[in-house]
Amino acid sequence: MAEHESLEFGKADFVLLDNVSLEEFMANLKLRFEKGRIYSYIGEVVVSVNPYRAMNIYGRDVIEQYKGRELYERPPHLFAIADAAYKAMKRRNKDTCIVISGESGAGKTEASKYIMQYIAAITNPSQRAEVERVKNMLLKSNCVLEAFGNAKTNRNDNSSRFGKYMDINFDFKGDPIGGHINNYLLEKSRVIFQQEGERSFHSFYQLVKGAPDAQLRSLHIQRDPTAYNYIKVGGQLKSSINDSAEFKAVADAMKVIGFTTEEIQTVYKILATILHLGNLKFGTDGDVTLIENSKLVSVLGDLLSTKEENVEKAMLYRTVATGRDVIDKQHTHQEASYGRDALAKAIYERLFCWIVGRINDIIEVKNYDARVHGKNTVIGVLDIYGFEIFQNNSFEQFCINYCNEKLQQLFIQLVLKQEQEEYQREGIPWKHIDYFNNQIIVDLVEQQHKGIFAVLDEACMNVGKVTDEMFLQALNGKLAKHAHYTSRKLSPTDKNLEFERDFRIRHYAGDVTYSVVGFIDKNKDTLFQDFKRLLYNSSNPVLKAMWPEGKLSITEVTKRPLTAATLFKNSMISLVEKLASKEPYYVRCIKPNDVKSPLLFEHERCKHQVEYLGLLENVRVRRAGFANRQTYPRFLQRYKMISEFTWPNHDLSSDKEAVKRLLQGCGFEHDVAYGKTKVFIRTPRTIFSLEEQRAEMVKRIVLFLQKVWRGTLARMRYRRMRAALIIIRAYRRYKVKSYIREVIRRFKNVRDMKDHGKHVKWPTPPKVLRKFEEALRSIYNRWWAWTLIKPLSPEKTVQIRAKVATLECLKGQRADLGLQRAWEGNYLKKDSPGTASSFTLVSSDLQRKDKFMRVLFSSNVRKINRFNKAEDRALLITDRHLYKMDPLKQYKPMKSIPLYNVTGVSISPGKDQLVVFHTKDNRDLIVCLQGMVPAGDSRIGELVGTLLSHFKSEKRKLQVNTVSPIHCSMNGRKCTVVVETKISQSQPDFTKSRSGYILSVPGN
């Protein structure tokens, strides 16, 4: 029951009225309308009064107030009924529908739009792009269908001139994934004729007033609605709707939905074709019928993408097949005009049906598998024309009012009749409430052989000329005794009925007088086959696809098509079956006045609607009845977790006893009744309380299930990981063994090979053994080197180590490293035999004095002294010192440098013998080896390798630089040494430069 509204606004729910009477009902309805409260409840039925003004009650903030709330928690609103239908669909996995009923102008179309808006707003919380696309297309489809299916009438500026039922499909999470639209009985006669004060369909005026000038020129259209006969008949060219703005909105909506540019252009070409058809004039020349404004024929040919002569022939002639003979029968003036109007109506109807079909192709659910995606549930929204009583009521109004009778019958069946019958069947104490059952009126229209539709179809099938008057006579003969049918012949004193024209039906909503003029013609819905062939043969593929029957041969015999009445009756029966299969929610719309005033509440006008809608009976049934009923197994299935006696399964004698125990435990036994197979719950508050308790328990159950399931998953994951680890370990062992076996096989006899297995190709190791392979290769290489070195003498071993050190350090940095010759080391003893004895004597004295173990290297050098002068000296390097000697003074030692004071050496990348010894005290020694025998021998590689090998044996690091120029420090001053090649130079020599020194060497 509704809450949160003070008594100044009246009773929000009519069930709460103090006295259930028509006077009380009307007084409450009027009070709420005057206070701006346009929505009220009758239990779970929403009563909506058209406010005839914009109201600020549909924004995002209002949507949030109703999202997920129960009906009685918030004031009455369309959003509440939409949320209730959505929750029922989501909670119970059951299809639901919202039936919006009321007469023309009561606000049904607007109500359906707000319901769609609400459903779109509350779904897709995760903002999935595909769901957003579907929602957007569903909303935009309303805009397109209104443009082509709605029109201004004397009662309503935006009256639906067709019936629309939309199914919205939802996935198991409750997000929209598609939809489907069914359309019913477009009032196509409005294309060529409108009553005084009315307009044709919005689309025509939107095109004329809103299309760009260039587009109008291409369509041969003027920006003046009065220039076109078909749309100026009603004399009402203005509307509260902005046609120019709506044109752009509709075009944009069609693009969003997915119409191609070519399809949109074809739509506007068809609209232009209809406008031009209305201006087509026929004349006669004797017995020959002519087109007076023949220029329009070429325009029509252009718009229809067909030949001009074919258009003219279809307008003036009809092809008749008699056996094998085919003749062209010329139309009379009347037949040509009839054919033109029939073509205009048929083209527009086909266009509208094609638009609906195109929208369905785009928005329908595709590739949905319930086994994979869960059950596909549906919410249906019915927005169909309301009950109509015009000054002149024809075939269309008859069908529309029959439709409303069927919907009223459904309401009676589900809300009034079935509910009371169910109480009696279940043994619930109940006082019967009388109501008017309109089944007798439905039978009057649709009963086989006797109903009005049956009589009309029979008249249309008779051979010979059958007139509307003959049809009326047949009705009078068959329905003379029917309480809800009369005519002037049956009621001679009733002067409101015309002889041989009118009949009256007493509908549930009141008496309606119908004119039979046009009934036969509209029921036959005749369109010459010539027009169908003309349009099928169009070069426009979209237009061609609309007329598939045009491909039939002229001589082909076809079955008689179903009449318009039969088609409509079948569609209504199908619609009612569809609605009856779903859980219905009702919106009953009331029109407060006929002048569209936001202030006027016409008491008698509203009272009549309340009576024929059966709202008072609805209040009585709802007040005496129960809001909810469920079978015992279904109730237990949903709520058994609330009670310890029923969770997880009960051990009581029956489900009924289990439900009783559950409700007693919750304290609700005063608000329920127990039937034979169902439990009946009186108020929504009890259901809401049960849902709250269930939601709380579901959280706990879910947490428990999550804990158990996560534990199960963890154990499964652990077992899989452990099994995988065992397999991985076993596989690794296998791969390691396989690899090692292969290595052993390949290197089995390497000791006996000449190259000790150097040519053997290593097997590819598994990834896990790559580092192992590197270590194994290193071990092999060390073994291979050892096998080579093992036979050598200690002296040769030392030489080999020095050469390896040179190669590792200088490979690729100097051209000649001297690796191919034997390294002597002590060259002063070898290169100068005449002075060798003096050198040996001095060397022995130094060994005794400084206690060095061996001579690493000796050579004659050219050096720079501290006065920046070049001089010849001898260089002796032992394992402890670096000695400078004067060869001219019997190799007298000049100065020694402790070897531990040497930090590095620098050499150039050329063939010169320049070497710079870097020291810790920045007093570097710059020398150039000379006096080599043979001449041109390179000893730099030997010097560097010998020093590297010695430093490595002492676990010290020697920095070796191969650069040019060489940077060094001389007597604490930074300088550079540059090597230059000179052709005239006979011996290497140093000269002073601005930045340091230049070593000039002989060159080619």
Curated annotation (Swiss-Prot):
Q: Which residues form the Myosin motor domain?
A: 9-695
Q: Does the keyword Nucleotide-binding apply?
A: yes
List localization entries: Cytoplasm; Perikaryon; Cell projection, Dendrite; Early endosome
Null mutant phenotype reads: Morpholino knockdown of the protein causes situs inversus, a left-right asymmetry defect where organs are placed at a position corresponding to the mirror image of the normal body plan. Causes laterality defects at the level of the heart, viscera and brain. Morpholino knockdown of the protein leads to the formation of a Kupffer's vesicle with reduced volume and dismorphic shape. Morpholino knockdown of the protein interferes with the normal cellular remodeling that gives rise to anterior-posterior asymmetry of Kupffer's vesicle.
What keywords is this UniProt entry annotated with? Actin-binding, ATP-binding, Calmodulin-binding, Cell projection, Cytoplasm, Developmental protein, Endosome, Motor protein, Myosin, Nucleotide-binding, Protein transport, Repeat, Transport
**Domain of life, source organism:** Eukaryota
Tell me which residues make up the TH1 domain: 812-1003
* Region called Actin-binding, residue ranges: 572-594
Question: A Pfam family in this protein?
Answer: Myosin_TH1
* Any GO BP: establishment of left/right asymmetry
> What further note is attached to this protein's record?
Agents that activate cftr increase the size of Kupffer's vesicle in myo1d mutants. Expansion of the lumen size is not sufficient to restore the normal spherical shape of Kupffer's vesicle and rescue laterality defects. Heterologous expression of rat Myo1d can complement the defects in Kupffer's vesicle lumen size and anterior-posterior cell shape changes.
- Kindly give the PANTHER family that the UniProt entry links to this protein: MYOSIN (PTHR13140), UNCONVENTIONAL MYOSIN-ID (PTHR13140:SF417)
Q: What is known of its domains?
A: Binds a calmodulin chain via each of the two IQ domains. IQ domain 1 mediates interaction with calmodulin both in the presence and in the absence of Ca(2+). IQ domain 2 mediates interaction with calmodulin in the presence of Ca(2+). The TH1 domain is required for activity in complementing zebrafish defects in Kupffer's vesicle lumen size.
Subunit record text? Interacts (via the two IQ motifs) with calmodulin. Interacts with F-actin.
Q: What does this protein do?
A: Unconventional myosin that functions as actin-based motor protein with ATPase activity. Plays a role in the formation of Kupffer's vesicle, an organ that functions as a left-right organizer during embryogenesis. Plays a role in vesicular trafficking events that are required for normal lumen expansion of Kupffer's vesicle. Required for normal orientation of cilia in Kupffer's vesicle, and thus for normal, unidirectional circular flow and normal angular flow velocity, which then mediates asymmetric gene expression and left-right asymmetric development.
What family does this chain come from, according to its entry?
Belongs to the TRAFAC class myosin-kinesin ATPase superfamily. Myosin family.
Q: What is this protein called?
A: Unconventional myosin-Id
- Per the UniProt record, the source organism is Danio rerio
